[in-house]
Amino acid sequence: MKFSEIISQFGETGTNHSLTSNPDHDPEIIGVAAIDEATNGTLSYVEGPKFGSFVSKTNATALILPQDEKLQELAQENGIVWISTSDPRLLFAKAIALFYQPYRPVPEIHPTAVIHSSAKVGSDVYVGPHVVIQQGVEIGDGAIIHPNVVIYPDTKIGDRTTLHANCTIHERTRIGADCVIHSGAVIGAEGFGFVPSRTGWLKMEQSGYTVLEDGVVVGCNTAIDRPAVGETRVGRNTVIDNLVQIGHGCQIGSGCAIAGQAGMAGGVKLGNRVILAGQTGIANQVKIGDGAIASAQTGIHSDVAPGEIVSGTPAIPYKLYLKVCAVYSRLPDMYQSLKQLQRKFKNSND
């Protein structure tokens, strides 16, 4: 694919590029690569001026650059064609899609699949080997169900949704259109509902529903639990990493991003566009406002306001957390100084 062809795919975001001043230099691009691993014929990207040293060292043929004239000149000097944009990483993501298409099997129902007679399977659906689809299940048009998936009764899967191998969809689950559930994920299993009694822990039946709205992505080995009553709900276009625990009755807004090993106790409510970095933990019934961000390993025990950035355990405002970190390594010396002052004060009083 010629560099000019790639530019044409970007539309209005691809108007500032090296071909404007040098239209004859239009090399063939055969793939994409990280800038430090790029080879001749590949396209890569640079996010900001601090990565300028990579531009002079890379073997990439083409680069996506920020709107920085110095980087553009440096690329030109090194014979690299370029296109500039306000968001290089976003444009690079679009470029990858030009060279790589995810595996999509041809629609068919494998003879080893077990499908209950009451299940409804839409058109152009792929059902792989050893899939189990139980009674009352509804599968939308164009869905892809990879090998060994188990779908419990009273479940609905939306159009064009993909269920990867070995994931499990429990009863009373509703999954919207264009969702992706990765391998090993478990959607709608019983929430951790036990009530103390004189004879031990009494199991509270989890009779509610688990709802994933359109465009949700769930990573490998993530669990999203079904509540005793009501719903556990994940809003549209929310993306969830591997190994995430979402407790029963959680309400997650639209456009959220939840990184690996984050965990939410029951009844947590996230607003829209919330970001939880890896290993964030949220206590029972906590509310997180729209656009809030929690950095890695944050422990949240109380509500977080919209747009707030928090860090640490227990969670505190991010700027305060940075000050605490700056003091932390000095605590032993500060403690020794305090002991000396205490001794001096005691001696002066004797």
Swiss-Prot record:
Q: How does it assemble?
A: Homotrimer.
Which pathway, metabolic or otherwise, does it act in?
Answer: Bacterial outer membrane biogenesis; LPS lipid A biosynthesis
Upper classification of the organism: Bacteria, Bacillati, Cyanobacteriota, Cyanophyceae, Nostocales
Its domain of life reads Bacteria
Query: Any idea which GO molecular function terms this record carries?
Result: N-acyltransferase activity; structural constituent of carboxysome shell
Q: Which InterPro entries match?
A: Hexapep (IPR001451), LpxD (IPR007691), Trimer_LpxA-like_sf (IPR011004), UDP_GlcNAc_AcTrfase_non-rep (IPR020573)
Q: What does UniProt list as catalytic? A: H248 (proton acceptor)
The answer to keyword Acyltransferase applying to this record is: yes
Cystine pairs annotated here are: none
Q: What is this protein called?
A: UDP-3-O-acylglucosamine N-acyltransferase
Per the UniProt entry, what species is this protein from, by scientific name? Nostoc punctiforme (strain ATCC 29133 / PCC 73102)
Tell me its EC number(s), please: 2.3.1.191
Catalysis performed (reactions): a UDP-3-O-[(3R)-3-hydroxyacyl]-alpha-D-glucosamine + a (3R)-hydroxyacyl-[ACP] = a UDP-2-N,3-O-bis[(3R)-3-hydroxyacyl]-alpha-D-glucosamine + holo-[ACP] + H(+)
What exactly does this protein do?
A: Catalyzes the N-acylation of UDP-3-O-acylglucosamine using 3-hydroxyacyl-ACP as the acyl donor. Is involved in the biosynthesis of lipid A, a phosphorylated glycolipid that anchors the lipopolysaccharide to the outer membrane of the cell.
Q: What class of enzyme is it?
A: transferase
Q: Which UniProt keywords apply?
A: Acyltransferase, Lipid A biosynthesis, Lipid biosynthesis, Lipid metabolism, Repeat, Transferase
**Which family is annotated?**
Belongs to the transferase hexapeptide repeat family. LpxD subfamily.
Q: Which Pfam families match?
A: Hexapep, LpxD
Gene Ontology cellular-component terms for this entry are: carboxysome; membrane
GO biological process entries = lipid A biosynthetic process
